[in-house]
Design a protein with these regions (language model features):
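The feature captures the beta-strand-to-loop junction immediately N-terminal to the Walker
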Residues: 54-56, 331-333
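Helix-to-loop junction immediately C-terminal to a conserved catalytic motif
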Residues: 69, 346
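Conserved ABC ATPase "signature" region
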Residues: 130-147, 423-444
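Conserved ABC ATPase signature
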Residues: 152-156, 160, 448-452, 456
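ABC ATPase C-loop
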Residues: 169-170, 465-466
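Catalytic Walker B motif of ABC-type/P-loop ATPase nucleotide-binding domains
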Residues: 177-181, 473-477
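Conserved beta-strand-loop-alpha-helix hinge in the C-terminal portion
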Residues: 233-258, 515-516, 525-541
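Transmembrane alpha-helix interface motif
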Residues: 540-584, 588-593, 597, 707-798
């Protein structure tokens, strides 16, 4: 089944009727803010009505959307008034509304795209036979139909994850679609495709649709109603969407309010400006940074000791020159490797191939000894020369208030090549105040950066880069979430940066941004982009935890059922923990290494996964040998304690047993997909569904944290903080809490915990699974029998 814009959306089963939304004097106030997110909102949205929700950046649009979805999480906040979905509070309408949030990463629940799309259908007890068609149709509608259902979600770019989140909501066929800037990270073609698919689905199912979007022209002709929020207040306007085309007074009012009104050219309305690249000035067109025959990848190519094939580059054959006074826009399809190229040029990722050369001007008067490639510079040398803004701003936040974030950047800035501060204390204060004003963040100066809206976070992240005064700015989607006024302020600041001789490099799909800076367009071509596309987000492609990530395992052991492997593992573990002797442990260890071909795991790969456990086993041997009771000949007298032949034998037995218990676990979990394991535990062992799926989401979160650790290291290097372990560890903890909170919102909005559920894939026990169980039993019996025959078997409870 395929769905393309313009074709009928084929509803599967019985679609939920549209939801009727009412609100009476509804207000919401965040705990740490002086003014409410919104106040006195009165709504009456008919079932099946399609609404475009607009307003200035920070007007409370996302908060209102979360309130309607029933997933507001701030326990210390206050909500007043009445809000109803079909006459009941939103919290009691679980599964009736599908919510798409701004952050793509926190909307991915499971490790394979097919399972992730099916998650909501399962929670809503959609019959198993209907789920595959719903999933394929939804993936086709959002432009991911070419990917296999077992494709890893970790290998998706930010834009692709946004499409995946939308597919999961469309597959629900809910009565209410709540979409928060659903096309913000998409390329222009993807924007039109996704918009048309959403509208087609809403029309076919009769669902109510509310879309938050700054660029009104994207959705205006596809919706019935336009609602404009007043920042900190209620509804400023509610009117038919078509009225905006012919009501000139209304258009002028909304332009003054900072909205992106169709046919109003925001760039044309900006002050006249001639880019330095067009001026006959010696300071212009001087190369600051040059890339030659670049190949880029998230994974390092310098791993010659590995037996596995080296990672393939995301891009190759890239030649790029960044000139003084010139802006460059890196464009291309989602997943093409734009962000990877940006981070490589910024010195945060090592080039996979080719050469990056910094000019003498960029190095500075005192930087003659710096290596040519920024990747080899110290963090302090980097931050005053190259400022980088990540696709996810939160990765770079390290302080408790907005003001402190900006001050940190200005205080970390040094005269290039020296330890001398670039700005005096007075200059730092003035610089911070000016940026707060220009970025329209003055009223949020003491707010926690993590509590800002998406657009406010984006402006702050750009401000932290500007505050350090670097010559080169690397920006990833800098205009996300901006209204027309804040867009203009960003353009103004970046124009001033170009006028001063700096350069701007931006990954962007925003054509207005490119026009506003008169940017050279560096379009990634099919010849440069490798297939299949690798991850393009700040977390994707980083080192992941091998036992917690999605497994596309075609080995004999990988194709066996998780329950059978758990039973086999239980037999082996019981045999090992029942005795303390080295012989049974040695038998199990030999068996595990012998089974590597069955699991299609290379010896080097296996050794890398178990070395930490081997080191722990050696420490256990020493600790037990020192602590055990003396018996036999004394081998080493340490004064306070001794090591004898008996205590050493005990230590060896305990260490070998501990190590042997780990080996089959690594073998089993390296060939077992977490989702398959959850299916088996819930369907075959009948464990509680909430426990199993909660644990599964936690496992994915742990895998994400391994990738986020790498990303946070890059972000702190960009901020001039180097690799401070405790600071980075605290940042990781903050990220874990925030992602877990958003992941919980995603799961709730997709019907998790709504009641009885179905499973898209059945878990069953096969004859081959029986072979696995018998194999585990045979290893356990062989280990025990060999130890008894050798006379070392020592039953622990005797």
């Amino acid at each position: 089944m395929s769905t393309t814009p313009g074709q009928p959306w084929a509803t599967t089963g019985t679609a939920a009727p549209g939801v009727h939304i009412t609100a009476a004097s509804f207000s919401y106030h965040h705990a740490d803010r002086e003014r409410p997110a919104f106040k006195g909102v009165n709504l009456d949205i008919a079932a099946g009505e399609k609404v475009l929700l607009a307003g200035a950046s920070g007007a409370g649009k996302s908060t209102l959307l979360h309130a309607i979805a029933g997933v507001l999480q701030d326990d210390d906040a206050g909500s007043f008034g009445d809000l109803r979905l079909d006459g009941v509070p939103p919290e009691q309408a679980r599964g009736r509304a599908g919510l798409m949030q701004q952050d793509p990463e926190s909307q991915v629940v499971l490790s394979r795209i097919g399972d992730d799309v099916a998650f909501a259908c399962e929670n809503l007890a959609v019959p198993r036979a209907e789920i595959p068609d719903r999933c394929r149709q939804a993936l086709q509608a959002v432009g991911l139909g070419h990917l296999p259902l077992d494709h890893s979600t970790a290998a998706l770019s930010g834009g692709q994850k946004q499409r995946l989140a939308l597919a999961g909501i469309l597959a629900m066929q809910p009565g209410l679609l709540l979409l928060d800037e659903p096309t913000a990270n998409l390329d222009p073609e993807g924007t039109d495709h996704v918009r048309d698919s959403v509208v087609t689905a809403a029309q076919a199912t009769g669902a109510t649709l509310i879309v938050v979007e700054h660029r009104l022209g994207t959705w205006l002709n596809q919706v019935d109603t336009l609602i404009v929020l007043e920042p900190g207040g209620g509804i400023r306007h509610r009117l038919p969407a078509s009225a905006l085309h012919h009501d000139e007074a209304l258009r002028a009012e909304l332009v003054d309010a900072g909205l992106w009104v169709p046919d109003h050219d925001v760039v044309e309305a900006l002050p006249t400006w001639l880019s330095p690249g067009q001026l006959p000035d010696d300071s212009a067109d001087q190369a600051l940074l040059t890339g030659t025959e670049l190949a880029v990848s998230r994974q390092s190519s310098a791993r010659s000791w590995r037996k596995t094939p080296p990672p393939q580059p995301v891009l190759s054959g890239v030649d790029i020159t960044l000139d003084s006074g010139v802006a460059t826009g890196i464009t291309g399809r989602n997943g093409a490797g734009k962000s990877t190229l940006l981070l490589t040029l910024g010195g945060l990722l090592a080039p996979h191939g080719g050469v990056i050369t910094a000019s003498a001007r960029l190095k500075g008067e005192h930087g003659a000894r710096l290596p040519s490639s920024p990747h080899h510079w110290r963090s302090a040398d980097l931050t005053s020369r190259i400022g980088t803004v990540f696709q996810e701003p939160e990765h770079q936040f390290v302080r408790h208030t907005v003001t402190q974030e900006l001050r940190l950047s200005a205080e970390q800035a040094k005269v290039p090549g020296t330890k001398e501060s670039l700005f005096t204390d007075q200059e730092v204060t003035e610089r911070v105040a000016a940026l707060l004003d220009r970025l329209r963040l003055t009223h949020l100066a003491e707010a926690n950066p993590f509590t800002l809206s998406g657009g406010e976070k984006r402006r702050l992240s750009v401000g932290t880069a500007l505050a350090a005064g670097p010559e080169v700015l690397m920006l990833d989607e800098p205009t996300f979430g901006q209204d027309a006024h804040t867009f203009g302020e960003l353009i103004g600041l970046l124009r001033e940066h170009l006028d001063s001789g700096g350069t701007v490099v931006a990954v962007t799909h925003d054509r207005d941004f490119l026009r506003g800076l008169d940017a050279d367009v560096f379009a990634l071509t099919a010849a440069e982009a490798e297939e299949p596309p690798n991850a393009d987000t700040s977390t994707a492609g980083a080192t992941a935890t091998p036992l917690l990530s999605a497994v596309r395992d075609t080995s004999w052991l990988g194709r066996r059922g998780p329950l059978a492997k758990l039973i086999a593992l239980s037999f082996i573990t019981i045999a090992l923990i029942s005795t303390i002797d080295p012989v049974s442990a040695a038998v199990v260890a030999v068996a595990c290494f012998a089974l590597l071909p069955v699991a299609n795991i290379r010896l080097g790969t296996f050794l890398r996964r178990i070395w930490i456990f081997a080191a722990a086993a050696v420490m256990a041997v020493w600790g037990a040998a020192v602590a055990a009771e003396e018996s036999g000949r004394v081998l080493l007298d340490l004064g306070l304690t001794t090591i004898s032949t008996g205590s050493l034998e005990m230590g060896l037995s305990l260490g070998a047993r501990a190590f042997a218990i780990v080996l089959p676990s690594v073998l089993i979990f390296s060939t077992t997909d977490p989702t398959d394991l959850a299916d088996a535990l819930a369907q075959q062992l009948k464990l509680p569904t909430r426990f199993v799926l909660g644990a599964l989401a936690a496992m994915r979160l742990l895998g994400l944290m391994a990738a986020h650790w790498t990303t946070l290291g890059h972000a702190r290097r960009a901020r001039g903080l180097g690799t401070r372990f405790l600071s980075q560890a605290f940042g990781l903890l903050v990220q874990a809490i925030r992602i877990a909170t958003r992941l919980a919102v995603t799961m709730e909005s997709r019907g998790f915990g709504a009641g009885e559920r179905t499973w898209s894939r059945s878990a069953c026990f096969t004859r081959a699974d029986g072979v696995v169980v018998l194999g585990g039993l045979a290893i356990a019996a062989s280990a025990t029998a060999t130890a008894i025959f050798a006379g070392t078997w020592n039953l622990v409870w005797m």
